[in-house]
Amino acid sequence: MAEMKTGDIRAMSDDQMDDAILNLKKERFNLRFQRATGQLEDTSRLREARRDIARIKTIAAQKRAGKTK
């Protein structure tokens, strides 16, 4: 999965964001195991997945804050 763009994330519904976070967490889990066993070739993917999760969580929080105002 390539790095997610902010515009794509903003277009997602809350349920889609939750699903994306869950998928990225699973991917990170698998990537960590691959790194530990020496099978991981693209080590930058770990960083991208971590940042994608943070990006989605940030936009979700902004959406929630906008709805409550």
UniProtKB/Swiss-Prot annotation:
Top-rank taxon: Bacteria
Cysteine disulfide links: none
GO cellular component entries: cytosolic large ribosomal subunit
Gene Ontology molecular-function annotations: structural constituent of ribosome
InterPro entries: Ribosomal_protein_uL29, Ribosomal_uL29, Ribosomal_uL29_sf
Entry keyword rRNA-binding: no
Record key words, sorted: Ribonucleoprotein, Ribosomal protein
Entry keyword annotation includes Ribonucleoprotein: yes
CDD domains named among the record's database cross-references: Ribosomal_L29_HIP
GO biological process entries: translation
Family statement drawn from the similarity comment of this UniProt entry: Belongs to the universal ribosomal protein uL29 family.
UniProt cross-references to HAMAP family, sorted A to Z: Ribosomal_uL29 (MF_00374)
Protein name per Swiss-Prot or TrEMBL: Large ribosomal subunit protein uL29
Organism this protein belongs to: Rhodopseudomonas palustris (strain BisB5)
Lineage of source species: Bacteria, Pseudomonadati, Pseudomonadota, Alphaproteobacteria, Hyphomicrobiales
